[in-house]
Amino acid sequence: PAASESGFRRDP
């Protein structure tokens, strides 16, 4: 799951 709410990169 993409977590670009706070602005950090996470695994898809």
From Swiss-Prot:
GO terms for biological process: neuropeptide signaling pathway. Keywords: Neuropeptide, Secreted. It is found in: Secreted. One of its GO terms (cellular component) is extracellular region. FMRFamides and FMRFamide-like peptides are neuropeptides. Belongs to the FARP (FMRF amide related peptide) family. This is Extended FMRFamide-10.
